[in-house]
């Protein structure tokens, strides 16, 4: 199957529901829909998948549903890096999702080059490298691919903004042809500077290019522990958000996350009018991965009910 056939085949998965897909919202059969739904980011299981080899990417939908009662998932491309254009593999993955009643929400894409590279040739190569993941995301029924506004830390604040906007605009145009969003996470460097990334979004000014605010990824420089205010940053990024990542590490005896005030954070999310998925991304070591996911889910459910 060539790329054109691949896109045409996957198009049937989006037809009839493209508008709903772009917002990340889904309807529940009967009952009142909560103001946000909970998804599971695959990175929450990175030790089980990457380090301990206890799970594979094909196990992920089943684990999300059977272990945690979650019916929406966010993939990490690192865990099936050589499968982006493996149609048989993607069909199997889609079949597993359908069997479990699990929706594929997005693919988090890393390792494909800097979309804001200082060299135009490398910047374009990074854009092209992401095409296969956009195609895979469409095939699986995702509404977005999550990408990085990486610049290599070359140039001034404004120069890096312009280059990131250029790469994202090019990728956004390609994703638009597929009915997909390209969304940027605050993920280190200047992308963790809320005002910088919000400025990039305004430069791009495309409806399908947005953000994925992560509650905890506001470290501009981890070596020096330079950190942007996470609440200010989230507030600055929420107007462009098409996904939200609920990062968690440690919990107190009451079940609250020690590093992030989830009530304050989710008030910001709700005030912005966001009604899509909030993805669990447990990254701590105090609890095992499964218990950390459960603790994050419980906290999200508690605060969601309080703010309803």
Question: Which residues are covered by each model-predicted region?
Answer:
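N-terminal pre-domain/capping segments
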Residues: 2-139, 155-162, 166-169, 176, ...
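Residues at the N-termini of beta-strands
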Residues: 72, 144, 243, 276-277
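A short helix->loop->beta-strand "cap" motif at the edges of active sites that frequently abuts
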Residues: 102, 180, 272-276
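Active-site groove signature of glycoside hydrolases
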Residues: 137-157, 178, 183-187
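Basic- and aromatic-lined ligand-binding clefts that recognize polyanionic substrates
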Residues: 175-208, 220-223
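Short strand-turn motif at the edge of the Rossmann-like AdoMet-binding core
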Residues: 186-187, 216, 282-283
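Substrate-binding/catalytic cleft of secreted carbohydrate-active enzymes
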Residues: 221-231, 259
């Amino acid at each position: 199957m060539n790329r054109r056939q691949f896109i045409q085949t996957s198009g049937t998965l989006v037809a009839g529901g493209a508008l709903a897909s772009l917002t990340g919202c889904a309807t529940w059969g009967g009952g009142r829909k909560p103001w946000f739904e909970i998804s599971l980011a695959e990175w929450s299981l990175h030790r089980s998948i990457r380090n301990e080899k206890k799970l594979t990417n094909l196990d992920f939908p089943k684990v999300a549903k059977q272990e945690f009662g979650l019916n929406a998932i966010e993939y990490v491309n690192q865990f099936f890096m050589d499968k982006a254009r493996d149609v048989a593999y993607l069909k199997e993955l889609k079949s597993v999702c359908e069997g479990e009643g699990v929706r594929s929400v997005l693919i988090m894409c890393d390792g494909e080059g800097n979309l804001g590279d200082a060299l135009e040739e490398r910047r374009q190569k990074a854009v092209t490298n992401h095409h296969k993941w956009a195609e895979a995301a469409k095939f699986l029924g995702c509404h977005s691919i999550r990408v990085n506004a990486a610049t290599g830390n070359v140039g001034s604040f404004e120069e890096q903004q312009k280059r990131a906007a250029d790469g994202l605009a090019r990728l956004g145009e390609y994703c638009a042809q597929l009915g997909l969003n390209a969304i940027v996470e605050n993920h280190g460097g200047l992308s963790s500077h809320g005002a910088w990334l919000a400025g990039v979004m305004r430069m791009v000014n495309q409806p399908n290019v947005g953000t994925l605010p992560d509650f905890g990824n506001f470290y501009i420089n981890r070596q020096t522990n330079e950190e942007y205010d996470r609440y200010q940053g989230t507030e600055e990024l929420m107007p462009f958000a098409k996904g939200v990542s609920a990062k968690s590490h440690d919990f107190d005896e009451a079940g609250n996350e020690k590093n992030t005030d989830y009530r304050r954070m989710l008030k910001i999310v709700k005030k912005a009018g966001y009604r899509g998925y909030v993805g669990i991304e447990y990254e701590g070591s105090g609890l095992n991965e499964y218990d950390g996911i459960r603790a994050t889910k419980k906290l999200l459910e508690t605060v969601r009910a309080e703010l309803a």
